[in-house]
A protein has these predicted regions:
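Short, surface-exposed interaction patches in beta-rich subdomains
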Residues: 61, 101-106, 112-121, 128-146, ...
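Surface-exposed or flexible loop/turn and strand-edge residues in extracellular/cell-surface modules
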Residues: 51, 77-79, 86, 152-154, ...
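Right-handed parallel beta-helix
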Residues: 168-207
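Short loop/turn positions at the edges of beta-strands in beta-sheet-rich folds
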Residues: 74, 161-163, 182-184, 274-276
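Active-site alpha-helical segments that house and flank conserved acidic catalytic motifs
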Residues: 80-83, 169, 261, 282
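Glycine- and small hydrophobic-enriched segments that form the cores of compact globular domains
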Residues: 119, 125-129, 151, 161, ...
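Short acidic/polar N-terminal linker immediately downstream of export determinants
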Residues: 2-112, 121, 134-164, 197-198, ...
Length: 324
């Protein structure tokens, strides 16, 4: 009787497990079919090549809105805003001109590339480029099950040299390779979220950048050759991710710059070149205890060496200031 009871219990348990598996498989099939129908409702899900030119040339003087300061509006830098989500993105300098060039490949039924232009009452102009998904993330996930589709969206944006701009860049959920070297930049504001992002200044900018602002969360951000931007000010914040900042580059001789890095829940590494003078203040907070330390850095003996006033704070993570 005991063996028969155990056998019956085993059969019942086995049948229950098979039922659960069948429900999961059936639910997955239904979810996949519904997701694919949802995706098709947005349009063509097949990737297509795209090439677009976006004019950055200033509007005619008579097009300035009433009350605008005509001369100021013609000479003020154009504000370029790039908002890029869910893809692999490359941003690079191009030949002199007055157009942004956008090239890439994506499914028009799943993603959308838009542009807009505006002028505020002061005459300041803005060009905005936005790339984002149209279909819900859950639908794209389930629709991709079983079809081996790994052809995600890719975009390359080329910024013309010689056009003065203030740049706002927001990149999220993806990968980015960004090179802003050789451009004419005023203020630069970069926000990177959820992904692997690399920003470089491979060659010196035309004129010193007034302010560099970086924000990184839930991902990794690598900053290379920051000295080639010759920034007067850097403000960088990071949380739930890692940040590496290389300060090498062609800093302006005799210049003074204020650099601030604030990091929480992640690692921060700041690499300092040997051809600058550095006043460093590094503060760390761990478990309710705060420490203040001054890293041992070699100071340049060149009387024209640039001076970097570096302030670093970290909490629930590790911050290092090192010298190559």
């Amino acid at each position: 009787m005991a063996r028969s009871g155990w056998k019956t219990a085993g059969l019942i348990a086995g049948a229950g497990c098979l039922s659960i598996i069948a429900i999961i498989i059936g639910g997955g099939i239904i979810a996949t079919m519904y997701a694919r129908a949802t995706v098709r409702s947005f349009g063509d899900p097949n990737p297509q090549s795209v090439e677009r030119r976006i004019a950055l040339s200033p509007p005619p003087a008579e097009a300035n809105p009433p009350g605008a300061k005509g001369e100021a509006s013609r000479t003020a830098p154009l504000h370029v805003r790039l908002e890029l989500q869910e893809g692999t993105f490359t941003i690079q300098p191009g030949q002199p001109g007055t157009e942004l060039q956008v090239q890439g490949r994506f499914a028009p039924g799943l993603f959308e590339l838009t542009e807009s232009h505006s002028t505020d009452p002061t005459g300041a102009r803005e060009a905005r480029v936005r790339f984002h998904s149209k279909a819900p993330a859950w639908a794209r996930f389930f629709a991709g099950i079983g079809n081996g589709d790994e052809d995600g969206p890719e975009l390359t944006i080329t910024i013309p040299r010689g056009t003065p701009i203030d740049l706002t860049l927001e990149v999220s959920v993806g990968r980015s390779q960004i090179d802003l070297g050789g451009l004419t930049l005023g203020d630069v504001n970069v926000t990177a979220t959820m992904g692997e992002h690399r920003l470089d200044f491979r060659e010196p900018v035309v004129k010193n950048v007034r302010e560099l602002r970086f924000s990184n969360s839930m991902g990794n951000l690598s900053l290379e050759h920051i000295g080639n931007a010759r920034p007067e000010t850097i403000n960088a914040t990071g949380s739930m991710g890692n940040v590496t900042a290389d300060l090498a580059g062609a800093w302006s001789p005799g210049s003074e710059s204020n650099l601030r890095f604030d990091q929480s829940m992640g690692d921060l590494t700041v690499r300092v070149p040997s051809n600058v003078r550095v006043n460093a203040d590094v503060r760390s907070s761990q478990g309710g205890e705060s420490t203040n330390r001054t890293p041992a850095l070699k100071q340049s003996d060149d009387p024209k060496a640039p001076t970097l006033r570096l302030h670093v704070t970290s909490s629930m993570g590790n911050a290092r200031v090192i010298q190559d």
